[in-house]
């Protein structure tokens, strides 16, 4: 048996794994997420390989989605202090780096910030040339503070990234042991949000290096010698090496994988997906089989950013959500991975959301649960209201739309959902997140501002499409499988010359 893929999703409660042969699910497994993460991964992967009778040499690739880096940021855990350099000349001084950050996170991460010569105007003219001497002086100051991660952001570097690239080379020469993140590789237009995303990336670089090494070691522990890919926020894959450099690009991979898996398992490409895990419920919209991306500023751990993220609405409701009888409420706190030990239906002493549906006779596992009928009815109504409200928030119109239920916690939903044309809970719904990881494609995205110089806009669009196609190949896509997924173009009326901004995204199947 050959050409097998393993998909893995590492959540805060469970680690799910799935083994796929083409479009066929051969085996699934769910293991509690372990404190060291790696042993949970190797255990889940080993389980699906054992179930199928496959050999380690049959596995051509492992695709892994994780919330490891997002959780570290939210919990302020394992974060590096960062040196922040802004190439701006005399501009932007009224809005210093990290303005608007939560104070405790800013104090933990922001240990040095310097505004330096450089940057560009909105029309591409230089504000000031880069000053190497000033940059090297800043490097000396950062070395005095023993900083080992640097975030560089230039004004309008999303349009002209060359100064940032030059600054990175200088910093790497002066601080050879430091990680260097530059904003033009991470965010879009919008100085503060792009700078914030770059700082977040920089503070996670040491954790990402250790985590990816641990993930690779978990494969070696079960004798897997195949490439490891990591899921990105937009539902596509990147290499493990790239994930070391850009941990922020994995933040939303959990709900994104679930949505991609829901599309594959249900065969429906346009729908609302409700993904209920042990702790949270995530609701998003599928458009042509891919998660709808948000067009708004995204807050991560209270920090405004502007990188690609799916438009997902989340609340603290899951199978392990704790039920309180005094004020009659459910969540947002959860017993998480201890559900099998603490829930009443498994012999524990904590009333959870799972116990509510067990008391209603909606599930056939565990011990009988004897709860007050009024409490059960009230909590069940609360959960129903939460789901209905979430679905209503993400709908694009008043027209009914299919709703796909996935995740192990989707057993909480046993009622009609307002606005749903139909409700589906596909086979293997509990492993949709891992299926989505295994089915993911690779992508290439190009976002450019071009002066038309008399050319028709269609010619400029074709130029950027070719660049996106090549970017997709560079990311590891099979050339003949590539298709253009999305094109956006807009005139830029504030420029003195005829110009437009064009964004093109291409996706393709992973090359063998």
In which residue ranges do the predicted regions lie?
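N-terminally biased helix-coil "hinge/interface" segments that flank
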Residues: 1-512
């Amino acid at each position: 048996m050959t050409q097998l893929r393993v998909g893995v999703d590492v959540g805060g409660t469970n680690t799910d794994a799935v083994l796929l042969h083409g479009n066929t699910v051969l085996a699934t497994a769910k293991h509690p997420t372990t404190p060291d993460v790696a042993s949970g991964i190797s255990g889940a992967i080993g389980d699906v390989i054992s179930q199928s009778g496959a050999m380690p040499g049959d596995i051509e690739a492992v695709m892994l989605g994780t919330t490891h880096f997002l959780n570290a940021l939210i919990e302020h855990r394992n974060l590096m202090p960062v040196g922040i350099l802004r190439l701006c000349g005399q501009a932007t001084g009224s809005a210093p780096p990290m303005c608007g950050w939560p104070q405790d996170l800013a104090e933990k991460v922001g240990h040095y910030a310097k505004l330096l010569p450089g940057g560009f105007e909105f029309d591409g003219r230089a504000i000031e040339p880069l000053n190497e001497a000033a940059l090297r002086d800043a490097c000396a100051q950062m070395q005095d503070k023993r900083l080992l991660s640097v975030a560089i952001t230039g004004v309008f570097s999303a349009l002209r990234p060359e100064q940032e690239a030059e600054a990175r080379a200088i910093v790497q020469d002066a601080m050879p042991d430091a990680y260097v993140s530059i904003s033009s590789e991470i965010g879009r237009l919008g100085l503060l949000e792009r700078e914030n995303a770059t700082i977040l990336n920089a503070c996670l670089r040491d954790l990402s290096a250790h985590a990816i090494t641990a993930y690779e070691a978990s494969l070696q522990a079960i004798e897997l010698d195949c490439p490891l890919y990591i899921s990105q926020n937009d539902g596509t894959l990147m290499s493990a090496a790239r994930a070391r450099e850009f941990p922020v690009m994995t933040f939303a991979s959990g709900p994104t994988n679930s949505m991609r898996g829901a599309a594959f398992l249900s065969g429906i490409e346009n729908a609302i997906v409700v993904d209920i895990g042990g702790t949270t419920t995530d609701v998003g919209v599928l458009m042509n089989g891919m998660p709808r991306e948000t067009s708004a500023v995204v807050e991560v751990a209270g920090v405004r950013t502007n990188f690609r993220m799916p438009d997902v609405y989340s609340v603290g409701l899951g199978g392990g959500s704790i039920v309180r009888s005094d004020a009659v409420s459910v969540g947002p706190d959860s017993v998480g991975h201890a559900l099998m030990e603490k829930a009443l239906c498994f012999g524990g002493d904590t009333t959870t959301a799972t116990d509510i549906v067990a008391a209603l006779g909606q599930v056939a596992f565990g011990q009988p649960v004897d709860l007050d009928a009024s409490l059960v009815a009230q909590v069940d109504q609360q959960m129903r209201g939460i789901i209905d409200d979430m679905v209503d928030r993400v709908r694009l119109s008043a027209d009914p739309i299919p709703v796909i239920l996935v995740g192990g916690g989707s057993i909480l939903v046993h009622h009609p959902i307002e606005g749903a044309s139909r409700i589906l809970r596909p086979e293997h719904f509990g492993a949709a997140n891992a299926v989505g990881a295994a089915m993911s494609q690779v992508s290439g995205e190009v976002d450019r501002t071009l002066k038309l110089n008399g050319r028709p806009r269609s010619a400029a669009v074709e130029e950027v499409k070719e660049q996106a196609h090549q970017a997709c190949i560079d990311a590891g896509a099979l050339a003949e499988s590539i298709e253009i997924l999305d094109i956006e173009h807009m005139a830029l009326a504030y420029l003195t010359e005829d110009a437009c901004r064009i964004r093109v995204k291409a996706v393709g199947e992973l090359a063998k």
